[in-house]
Amino acid sequence: FDKNQPWGVIRDLNVVNFKR
């Protein structure tokens, strides 16, 4: 994800949590 994009970080966390 891009650190410049806050929503990118949140989205990445959601994807990891979902896969987990």
UniProtKB/Swiss-Prot annotation:
Keywords: Allergen, IgE-binding protein, IgG-binding protein. It comes from the Eukaryota. The keyword Ion transport does not apply. GO terms for molecular function: IgE binding; IgG binding. Disulfide bonds: none annotated. This is Allergen Asp fl 2.
